């Protein structure tokens, strides 16, 4: 079944209600498509359902309301009642005082509000034509995350067989895509501008993200406890981390990570700017890290994270291209430690800080750098790599330029094996390895 909404009926009625009624009608008839016409349509929350495609036609714009209570979703149709166990009044709290993560794990929390939502749905899609847009309009919520973040653009819980394709998201008041416990997801040809995280995956399996263009205010691709994830052909630009990610069997290929960042992290805005939904504005700062490991306690991690391959990628003007710091001073790297990560066929330019690889004493991770060409920014004056609590570290076919520190590798522990093969440090007169005597210190990402 297909319902093509027309501009007149969307103008004459509440667009949220009209779109929701169309989705429900298609769902009742076994599935199909709801098409949104060209125009600017202000909405609160639309609940997507199984076997339904939301199709944004050319220049169709879904604009999020700036009234936070428009996102207080209530199932009125009786089609798919929300279980009481999925509801909570818990609000976001800072990590160092929160008692649990109910605000995040329960789909009907205030934190999980969104423009487009789905719970326990299968075979669903959001697709867009040229010029289609989901605009969160930086909706302010004084009870939201960090006391200013509003709803996500797309929020999916426990969904399977998902296609996200062809549209743009801008100014998302929290994550552009917040996906929890989802299976079999394909996201392709999506553009994300400003806002917060581009795609954030939590406990998701079998995910493909390809040919997407991220210029975000927070991490481009993020998440923990994910399995079987492929990211390819994407462009990633941010003031935070290109990828802040934890998972098992993860491949990142043919991507470009680059700075300086196009948009500021909204946390850096003044309280008045946040309250008034001011634009994020240009950043000009560098990307903190191309790849940052992520393993907080927002939920149990099912498998040991590892078998992560990052290959055939370019890193331009990122402060560092690897940040794994399990030393204990970063709350988002304290759950399960990382087993292994491989960087292969990487060209990195404008690097300003050492790669950090600091594992757990009880599980010493393994790092491989193969076919790497790295050029440091002028005045960086640092080692290539900081090491601690490591198993096997392999540097093979590596060329380094403008390396001005006293050593290639600085080690705080001597418990692992370092193998260096065919390493060419142009103009470098320091030593290959050096043991540190000072306490370990690392700027968090």
Model regions and ranges:
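Extracellular/periplasmic carbohydrate-active domains that bind, remodel
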Residues: 1-445
């Amino acid at each position: 079944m297909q319902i093509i909404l027309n501009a007149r009926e969307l103008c004459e009625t509440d667009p949220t209600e009209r779109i929701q009624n169309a989705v429900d009608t298609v769902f009742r008839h076994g599935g199909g498509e709801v098409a949104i016409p060209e125009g600017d349509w202000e909405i609160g929350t639309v609940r997507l359902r199984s076997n339904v495609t939301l199709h944004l036609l050319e220049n169709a714009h879904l604009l999020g309301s700036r009234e936070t209570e428009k996102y207080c979703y209530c199932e009125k149709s009786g089609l798919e009642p929300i279980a009481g166990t999925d509801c909570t009044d818990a609000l976001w709290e800072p990590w160092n005082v929160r008692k649990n993560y109910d605000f995040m794990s329960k789909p009907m929390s205030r934190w999980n509000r969104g423009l487009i939502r789905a719970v326990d749905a299968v075979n669903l899609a959001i697709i867009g034509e040229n010029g289609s847009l989901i605009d969160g309009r930086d909706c302010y919520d004084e009870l939201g995350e960090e006391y200013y973040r509003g709803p996500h653009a797309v929020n999916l819980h426990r969904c399977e067989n998902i296609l996200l394709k062809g549209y743009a998201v801008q100014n998302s008041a929290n994550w552009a895509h917040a996906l929890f416990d989802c299976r079999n997801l394909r996201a392709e040809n999506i553009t994300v501008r400003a806002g917060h995280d581009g795609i954030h995956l939590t406990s998701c399996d079998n995910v493909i993200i390809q040919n997407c263009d991220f210029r975000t205010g927070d991490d481009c691709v993020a998440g923990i406890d994910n399995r079987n994830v492929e990211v390819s052909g994407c462009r990633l630009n941010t003031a935070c981390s290109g990828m802040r990610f934890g998972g098992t069997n993860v491949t990142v290929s043919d991507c470009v990570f680059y700075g300086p960042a196009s948009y500021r992290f909204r946390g850096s805005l003044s309280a008045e700017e946040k309250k008034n939904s001011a634009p994020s504005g240009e950043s000009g700062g560098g990307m903190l890290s191309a790849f940052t490991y992520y393993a907080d306690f927002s939920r149990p991690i099912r498998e040991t994270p590892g078998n992560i391959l990052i290959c055939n990628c370019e890193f331009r003007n990122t402060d560092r291209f690897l940040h794994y710091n399990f030393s204990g001073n970063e709350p988002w790297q304290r759950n399960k430690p990382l087993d292994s990560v491989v960087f292969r066929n990487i060209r990195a330019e404008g690097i300003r800080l050492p790669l950090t690889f600091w594992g757990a004493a009880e599980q010493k991770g393994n790092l491989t750098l193969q076919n790497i060409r790295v050029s440091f920014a002028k005045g960086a004056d640092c080692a290539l790599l900081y090491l601690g609590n490591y198993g096997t570290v392999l540097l093979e076919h590596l060329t380094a330029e403008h390396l001005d520190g006293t050593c290639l590798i600085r080690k705080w522990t001597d418990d692992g094996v370092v193998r260096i093969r065919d390493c060419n440090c142009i103009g470098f007169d320091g030593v290959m390895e050096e043991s540190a005597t000072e306490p370990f210190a690392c700027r968090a990402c």
